[in-house]
């Protein structure tokens, strides 16, 4: 009996990339503005060629509609990520808290959506990227 393993999504890093950063489980929320400020400072200063956001970027994301609400936290987060995506490639993977992030979010921010899991080929190595919540079996 042979077991068939479905193919995983793959992303091949451009040859010029030398540094990538991985962030996960920031759980951004309006009640914790210091976390958003820390993310802003990080995004303005990182020398990374690309940034990977591996799930639970938000404590909760109820849908892309909130981006349009005046002075909304979601709108501020989206604007921050859009600015960062103009500087370097940004990638986003759903977590169990922000699985409703959708096409409108990615369109407006310029952040590319990754499947979970995705294999990243970078500097002649293969890296398995996953949020990991699907691995919690108990």
What is each stretch, according to the model?
Residues 8, 13-23, 28-122:
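Core catalytic region of metal-dependent phosphoesterases/phosphodiesterases
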Residues 2-5:
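C-terminal regulatory/interaction regions
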């Amino acid at each position: 009996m042979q077991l068939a393993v479905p193919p995983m999504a793959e992303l091949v890093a451009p040859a010029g990339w030398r540094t990538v950063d991985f962030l996960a489980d920031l759980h951004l929320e309006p009640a914790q503005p210091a976390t958003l400020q820390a993310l802003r400072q990080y995004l303005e200063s990182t020398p990374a060629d690309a940034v990977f956001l591996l799930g639970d970027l938000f404590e909760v994301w109820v849908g892309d509609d909130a981006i349009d609400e005046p002075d909304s936290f979601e709108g501020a987060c989206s604007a921050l990520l859009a600015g960062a995506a103009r500087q370097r490639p940004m990638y986003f993977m759903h977590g169990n808290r922000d699985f409703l992030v959708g096409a409108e979010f990615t369109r407006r921010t310029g952040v590319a959506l990754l499947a979970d899991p995705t294999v990243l080929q970078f500097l002649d190595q293969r890296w398995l990227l996953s949020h990991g919540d699907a691995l919690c079996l108990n």
